[in-house]
């Protein structure tokens, strides 16, 4: 028996004896590296230095910060404690109270003639204002206390101390600003930049989405993160609310762009394009936008489109499943966390996952121990998580952005849709099949709209600015000769970037020159964007110009509808009446009435809008706009919206004779004949 056999036999005997005692020996690591959690714990305790105990008082913490500075204003040791206190104190102590304690300490040191301590306190306040200037402007009470502090220094301090309070050297901006948009390399002056979604390369689209995401991520401050953790909501945190709104906008934009295509094969092309965009986002390590795009592709309103998914290639289907697995919430996003831990260089996190970690860490331990002292390890752990996120804001994106394409994406993401509207459009594209179908292979990785209620609905001023920027970009690239107009073909392709076609907001037919001026394009985009962004589809009334037989009043301004013929407009679905100039300002939801039997009665009766009888097409001129349910037809969806223009307007709607009143269904209706 050789030596190895002897050792093996002895090990077996030992294990047998242990098993005989009925208690298995616990496996112990031997000569192995510590886990990352253990390394982080040790490093955190080392960074705390003399405050490595589990608790300390506010005065002890403040005293340690004062001692960090020497007589020349240099840090005697590392700045970890100083940065942690200045970043995290507002979690347990108002900033104005911290400043008041510094003022009291300075006055006491001046009374005892401790000039070095006075100077150290001045250095601390100066460091605070220089590196955390945004906190001062957000708290008026803190500004008042700081002002009193420097007034006291001017009265009781020496020349060296007073020089530190020079306002011209304080409040310097901290951190890099958002990256400036740059034109694509090699872009000549006469070369047109394609502003068409179908012409945008997946690489280009992913880069511009990454730029928008990084610009939004850079605006988030530690105060925003603290507000979310303490309140459990993004309300009151504009930068964080904007970041969440951007993610939700991207997700819904993906859904509506897919549903805006009439045929399954066309929808599959859009699906395939967004899958390739998601793959490129993965390569760019932009996980937040990747989550939004993948969530939009896996949304139940999209995954139920069986006819569309049939046209996807096996490679695209496999890629989507892999991305879904990467962002799955299974085991607390274990797959994503492993991938994120191995990332280096430029990267953007899934913000919702990391905010969830902050909330869990905050709720796990109390702020103070039973004796009233601060729980220092908790504050330090929260600071390390915040510092990790803040460090990512100083990155430099690996890609450039074209300003014109940014304007296009910005306006596209401004559009607002509710879940009900998206589902309604999904069922209009592919109605329910009575036969049982196999379940969809796609699983939603998470609830994409992780902050519910955050809906990106811009105000009219912001929307107008975005439209003006886009129109300027369009004419810069599509009208290089400066004629002041673009062709009908360019107009139709440009309007195809937006899912207006889903709601009857097609480019209006043109007569004569067939070109569109800057004013006409601006009017079209403002009109369509305002409806889709601010009112939502439920507010769209099917207005028609009518002649009232009885005295009728405008529902919007309460004015009398007077005239000989065609005094105003009335909605075909709910019966609401208004002036021509008031129809775009109606803020009442269109509630479609159930179909009634018998004589509907005379039109124009002053009864509530929800119970007003339908129009009699035999006695009034009416315009009918219906939604074609055939997804494969070559025609556009015909127009179940409309805040219609009059027949002599530059946007002339299609006139369809209406011999009999037939109420269309909510999802779709048969074309009028």
UniProtKB/Swiss-Prot annotation:
Keyword list, A-Z: Calcium, Cell membrane, Cytoplasm, Differentiation, Guanine-nucleotide releasing factor, Lipid-binding, Membrane, Metal-binding, Zinc, Zinc-finger
Coiled-coil stretches: none
Tissues expressed in: Expressed by mast cells and their progenitors (at protein level). Expressed by dendritic cells.
Ranges annotated as Phorbol-ester/DAG-type zinc finger: 540-590
Domain Ras-GEF: 201-432
Major place of residence: cytoplasm
PANTHER family found in the cross-reference section: GUANINE NUCLEOTIDE EXCHANGE FACTOR (PTHR23113), RAS GUANYL-RELEASING PROTEIN 4 (PTHR23113:SF157)
Protein name per UniProt: RAS guanyl-releasing protein 4
Domain N-terminal Ras-GEF: 49-175
One Pfam family here: RasGEF
Family: Belongs to the RASGRP family.
Disordered as annotated region, ranges: 1-34, 164-188, 592-633
Native source organism of the sequence: Mus musculus
Feature: compositional bias, Low complexity: 164-173
């Amino acid at each position: 028996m050789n030596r190895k056999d002897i050792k093996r036999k002895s090990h077996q005997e030992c294990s047998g004896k242990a098993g005989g005692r009925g208690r298995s020996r616990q496996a112990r690591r031997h000569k192995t590296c510590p886990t990352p959690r253990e390394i982080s714990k040790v490093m955190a305790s080392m960074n705390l230095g003399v405050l490595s105990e589990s608790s300390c008082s506010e005065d002890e913490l403040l005293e340690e910060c004062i001692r960090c500075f020497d007589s020349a204003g240099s840090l005697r040791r590392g700045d970890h404690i100083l940065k942690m206190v200045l970043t995290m104190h507002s979690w347990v102590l108002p900033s104005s109270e911290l400043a008041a304690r510094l003022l009291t300490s300075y006055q006491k040191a001046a009374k005892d003639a401790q000039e070095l301590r006075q100077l150290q306190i001045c250095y601390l306040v100066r460091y605070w204002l220089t590196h955390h200037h945004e906190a001062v402007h957000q708290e008026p009470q803190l500004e008042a206390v700081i002002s009193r502090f420097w007034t006291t220094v001017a009265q009781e301090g020496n020349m060296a101390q007073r020089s530190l309070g020079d306002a011209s050297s304080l409040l310097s901006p901290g951190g890099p600003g958002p990256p400036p948009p740059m034109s694509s390399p090699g872009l000549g002056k006469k070369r047109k930049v394609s502003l068409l979604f179908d012409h945008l390369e997946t690489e280009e689209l992913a880069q511009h989405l990454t730029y928008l995401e990084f610009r939004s991520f850079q605006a988030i401050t530690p105060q925003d993160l603290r507000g979310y953790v303490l309140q459990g909501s993004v309300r009151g945190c504009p930068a964080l609310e904007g970041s969440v709104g951007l993610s939700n906008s991207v997700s819904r934009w993906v859904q509506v762009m897919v549903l805006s295509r009439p045929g399954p094969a066309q929808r599959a092309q859009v699906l395939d394009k967004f899958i390739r965009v998601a793959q490129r986002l993965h390569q760019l390590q932009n996980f937040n936008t990747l989550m939004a795009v993948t969530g939009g592709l896996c949304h139940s309103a999209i995954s139920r489109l069986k006819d569309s998914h049939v046209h996807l290639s096996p490679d695209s289907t496999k890629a989507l499943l892999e991305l879904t697995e990467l962002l799955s919430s299974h085991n607390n996003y274990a797959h994503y966390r492993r991938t994120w831990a191995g990332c280096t260089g430029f990267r953007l996190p899934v913000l919702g996952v990391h905010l969830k970690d902050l909330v869990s860490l905050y709720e796990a331990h109390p702020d103070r121990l039973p004796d009233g002292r601060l729980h220092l390890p908790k504050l330090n752990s929260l600071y390390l998580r915040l510092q990790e996120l803040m460090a990512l804001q100083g990155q430099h994106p690996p890609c450039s952005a074209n300003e014109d394409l940014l304007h296009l994406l910005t306006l596209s993401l401004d559009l607002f849709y509710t879940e009900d509207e998206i589902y309604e459009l999904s069922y209009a594209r592919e109605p329910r099949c009575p036969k049982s179908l196999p379940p969809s292979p796609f699983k939603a990785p998470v609830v994409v709209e992780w902050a519910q209620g955050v809906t990106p609905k811009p105000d009219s001023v912001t929307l107008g600015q975005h439209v003006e920027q886009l129109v300027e970009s369009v004419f810069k690239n599509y009208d290089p000769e400066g004629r002041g107009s673009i062709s009908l073909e360019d107009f139709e392709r440009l309007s195809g970037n937006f899912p207006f076609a889903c709601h009857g907001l097609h480019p209006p037919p043109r007569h004569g020159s067939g070109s569109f001026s800057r004013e006409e394009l601006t009017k079209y985009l403002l009109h369509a964007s305002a409806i889709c962004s601010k009112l939502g589809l439920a507010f769209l009334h099917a207005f028609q110009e009518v002649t009232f037989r009885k005295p009728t009043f405008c529902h919007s301004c309460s004015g009398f509808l007077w005239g000989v013929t065609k005094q105003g407009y009335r909605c075909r679905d709910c019966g609401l009446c208004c002036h021509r100039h008031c129809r775009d300002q109606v803020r009442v939801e269109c509630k479609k009435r159930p179909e009634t039997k018998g004589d509907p009665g005379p039109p124009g009766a002053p009864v509530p809008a929800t119970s007003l009888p339908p129009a009699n097409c035999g006695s009034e001129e009416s315009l009918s706009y219906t939604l074609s349910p055939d997804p494969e037809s070559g025609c556009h969806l015909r127009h179940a919206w409309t805040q219609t223009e009059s027949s002599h307007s530059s946007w002339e709607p299609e006139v369809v004779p209406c011999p009999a009143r037939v109420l269309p269904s909510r999802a779709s209706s048969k074309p009028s004949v």
